[in-house]
A protein has these predicted regions:
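Conserved alpha-helical substructure of the radical SAM core
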Residues: 19-123
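Radical SAM enzyme [4Fe-4S]-AdoMet core and its adjacent flexible, acidic
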Residues: 2, 18, 27, 160, ...
Length: 362
């Protein structure tokens, strides 16, 4: 029987009457062919939201309260589901939210995930995306637990603009301290994600370029997508890749870098002297769906094959019903075959996804 209980973090937890599985329950199965969708794309990157709670109320993201809208799974349940994905060929796992550092068991989750091995016998590439507010005290424990990389969401490099966006007083100093703690812990390359909105923070572009050089971080600008809870998005509010490159280039000449892999989402640039790096993720003006290698698992155990999907696939429901690993794997393989060819932002009839970004996971 399914039980709903309030967790110590004040989010809702889904609990199963099952023993916590050991990592050895998820052996690598080298006989599996790569996890491939019906468009020939190999899926090797899993994004897992471990909560949809967030301690920020960013103007372009949330209109509601900080608390959870969807249930969260227990740690052993995330481990079971992630392990099934890894047995199918997933090599990269990124923990997201909401704000994943609100989970008090996040370090333990990273430690357990670091024990998993890919089909080739390698360690997983473990990453985490955070707003950075709680990062200062957690950076070193996360690194020690096995986290490889971290990305911090940061939408301005001056306190007034930043706190106007987050609507949390003192947030800029907390995030800056978290970034520096992560860098000191060796969580590299350290990436900073900035969502640009015309009229909100597009005056920060040149300052972010200088920040990348001064703080030894990779700054990635992201075109604003229609994933917010409200009705803020319009094509006119999007600051495009071309505009970003032109503006930075006038202040600091840029040199484009080659992609490291075909599925890389960011167009990468360094500066004329090779010091510092920026990336631009342009899903609106230059969609990269053709090389997408990603699948998402929501905090309540639903598979989403695209950020903009109108359909969710209830993997956790099958686990709750007693499905074994073979059945779960078969369901994942079937679901991946339904992965959309591309999104349809800006086209007639486009519908926003059934969840906003904070409830899907970045």
């Amino acid at each position: 029987m399914l039980r709903l209980s309030a967790g110590s973090e004040k989010g809702i937890r889904l609990k199963l009457p099952m023993a916590a599985p050991s990592i050895s329950a998820f052996p690598a199965q080298a006989s599996h062919s790569p996890l491939t969708d019906s468009h020939g794309r190999v899926i090797h990157d899993l994004r897992v939201s471990i909560t949809d709670r967030c301690n920020y109320k960013c103007v372009y993201c949330r209109t509601g309260e900080v608390g959870a809208q969807y249930p969260e799974l227990a740690l052993d349940e995330y481990l079971r589901l992630i392990g099934v994905f890894v047995a199918l060929g997933i090599t990269k796992v990124r923990l997201t939210g909401g704000e994943p550092l609100l989970r008090r068991d996040v370090v333990e989750l990273v430690r357990e995930l670091s024990r998993l091995r890919t089909l080739d016998g390698d360690k997983l590439d473990l990453a985490l995306t955070t707003n950075g507010h709680l990062l200062e005290s957690l950076a070193q424990p996360l690194k020690d637990a096995g986290l490889n990389r971290i990305t911090v969401s940061m939408d301005a490099v001056d306190a007034a603009t930043f706190e106007h966006i987050t609507r949390v007083e003192g947030s800029y100093a907390k995030v800056l301290a978290g970034i520096r703690a992560a860098r000191a812990a060796g969580l590299a390359p350290l990436k900073i994600n900035c969502v640009l909105l015309r009229g909100f923070n597009d005056d920060q572009i040149e300052s972010f370029a200088r920040f990348a050089r001064e703080e030894d971080v990779v700054v990635r600008f992201i075109e604003f997508m229609p994933l917010e809870e409200g009705r803020l998005w319009t094509p006119e509010i999007v600051v495009t890749l071309r505009e970003i490159v032109d503006r930075i280039g006038r202040a600091l000449p840029l040199v484009e870098l080659p992609p490291r892999e075909a599925s890389e989402t960011a167009r990468r640039y360094t500066f004329f002297d090779g010091v510092g790096e920026i990336g631009i993720i342009a899903p609106v003006s230059q969609a990269f769906c053709g090389a997408c290698s990603r699948v998402r698992l929501t905090s309540d155990g639903k598979i989403r094959t695209c950020l903009f999907s109108q359909v969710e696939h209830d993997l956790y429901g099958r686990l709750r019903a007693g499905a074994g690993d073979d059945e779960l794997r078969a369901y994942i393989v079937q679901t991946i075959q339904e992965k959309e060819a591309r999104h349809h932002i800006g086209e007639p009839g486009f519908l926003k996804p059934s969840r906003s970004m904070v409830h899907i996971g970045g």
